[in-house]
Structure formats: structure tokens, C-alpha cells
């Protein structure tokens, strides 16, 4: 963790707090919010990590988001969630947030830095897609573009995710690691078994705005995912008209498209680099929201 914080300091990343949550913030000096509003600069990015070791396990993804020479740079927000990250010394370790608090806290962070004026892009992985779904349902106009990687937020009424993550006999080294170092870790086990509101956490296809618009939404599925039934999720999304935004990666494992350097991670970041013109109803909605908040 100290190594990660040293890297953050080198990239001029600040650690701040809002309500119960610490978060990392990077604001590039050459980024201009007016350009983002006009679609001439990338939108700020909110990164929502999954279960495991928190920010350190996503070092490659976060480093890519912070920008490299010759690539567009944007503000990056990364909430640190102790109940999902082995942070057993945190006073919040056994007190995970639920949908209302999650949406309200993240909206407060976004407004604190003025990013509600242009809206944000959100990239989430695994359990992070559930927090992503809270935002989509409660702060619809604020979330301008979405990348959902290994999304466990779909089809939570089927048994695969629960069974594979908590009960299935481990048949591989990857599954063994997930079982003993993730699923049975105290904070994560407490979150999953005592504070997991299935009905609030599920995201229905009709609740995902622009679900089949490749300029607004991207969904990445790993064909050999050990947590969710990726082929089943792909078929479910296709039945609901969500085809053009889905990238299915045969043979890839859970986290493989975002935790290590690969062409799919490059694809995600390149997609986020694109400016997004805000016209018509979208900008009117954002202006209306800002006026009401004021």
C-alpha cells in the first residue's frame, strides 16, 4: 500500500475525505471543464473497485487512467472502500454503505469539485458495478458514460454469482484464491452475507441509459469468469437488445481485462479519452440539476 501511495504522490494524486469515505483525486493542470462541457476534452472519471485488496490490485488500470505522454488526461476520482479492501484497521471496516448513502456520498464528491457541470464517466469492476448501478438509478443525469467490467449487477436473481463466489468447491488455483483471500475475508464476508440487499443491487436492462449506444456504454465480459456466468449474462443482455456495447472475451478470467496490461484495458482508456459532445436534452438535464441543487 505504501508503494501505491508513493506512486500516487508522484502523479500528484491527493487523498481526501467526504463523509465516511476516503477517496483519491487527480486533477491534471491542463484539463479545462469548459472544454469537457463542449466535448473537446475527456470527462472526469470515477473508478469503482471490486472486492479484494482495493486500489493496489488496480494499479495498472489507475495508472492508465492518470494518463501517459501523448494521451489525453482527465480528472480521476477513486473512492477507497475499506469493507471491500482488507482495511481491517479502518473504523468503517464492518459498516458497508447501502444504495442511498453510496449515491449521496459520491454525488457530494462530484459536486464538491464542480464536475456535475460536465457530468462524469464511470468505470467499475465486479462488486464496483453494484455501486455503479446505484449511481445510474439515482443520479442518472450525472453519469454520462459507463464502462462495466465483469458486471455482477445483472441477473442477481439467478444462483450463479452467489453459488460460485460463496459455495462452489474450488476447482482451480484462481478459485481457491478467491475463496480464501476474498470471499472469506472478514470484512468482505460481512458485506456479502449480512449487508447485501439483492433487490437494491440488481440493475435491469431498462434502467441502464443508452445501454446499446457504443458512444455511451461499454460492457466487458470474461468468457472463463469464475464468479459470474458470462455466457448467460451475454445472452440475457442480447435478449434485451444490448448487443453493440458488449465485448465478450473468450477464455479470459475474472479481472483479466482490467487488472493487468492488455489490449482491452487500452481499449477502455482510449474510449474514455474521447470527448463527448453534450447537446440537447443531456445538457439541459445537467443544467436543470445544477439549478435545483443551488
Language-model features: where?
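Short, small-residue-biased leader/transition segments that mark boundaries at the very start
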Residues: 2-4
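Short, surface-exposed "cap/lid" segments of acyl-processing enzymes
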Residues: 16-73, 80-82
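Short alpha-helix in the alpha/beta-hydrolase fold that links the catalytic acid
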Residues: 61, 229-239
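Active-site nucleophile loop of the alpha/beta-hydrolase fold
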Residues: 81, 147-157
